[in-house]
From Swiss-Prot:
Cross-referenced HAMAP family: Ribosomal_uL29 (MF_00374)
GO biological process entries: translation
UniProt xrefs under InterPro entries: Ribosomal_protein_uL29, Ribosomal_uL29, Ribosomal_uL29_CS, Ribosomal_uL29_sf
Pfam families: Ribosomal_L29
Encoding gene per record: rpmC
Cellular component annotations (GO), alphabetically ordered: cytosolic large ribosomal subunit
Protein's UniProt name: Large ribosomal subunit protein uL29
Keywords, comma-separated and alphabetical: Ribonucleoprotein, Ribosomal protein
GO MF term (any one): structural constituent of ribosome
Residue ranges crossing the lipid bilayer per the database entry: none
Similarity field: Belongs to the universal ribosomal protein uL29 family.
SUPFAM superfamilies linked: Ribosomal protein L29 (L29p)
Length: 63
């Protein structure tokens, strides 16, 4: 997910995206805790995507 794609979305769409990413992060953490997660780099990718979405939401709210 690129930041340029996210800037074109509305705040409502970004909030929906954020909710989906948080759910995905939860599922990945549960898989990691039970030893089922083989691609541990996915945790890092999702965490950074959450940060991207939150940053753009904050910038749009301030504008």
């Amino acid at each position: 997910m690129k930041a340029s794609e996210l800037t074109q979305k509305s705040v409502e769409e970004l909030n929906a995206e954020l909710l989906g990413l948080l759910r995905e992060q939860f599922n990945l953490r549960m898989q990691h805790a039970t030893g089922q997660l083989t691609q541990t780099h996915q945790l890092k990718i999702v965490r950074r995507n959450i940060a991207r979405v939150k940053t753009i939401i904050t910038s749009k709210a301030g504008a």
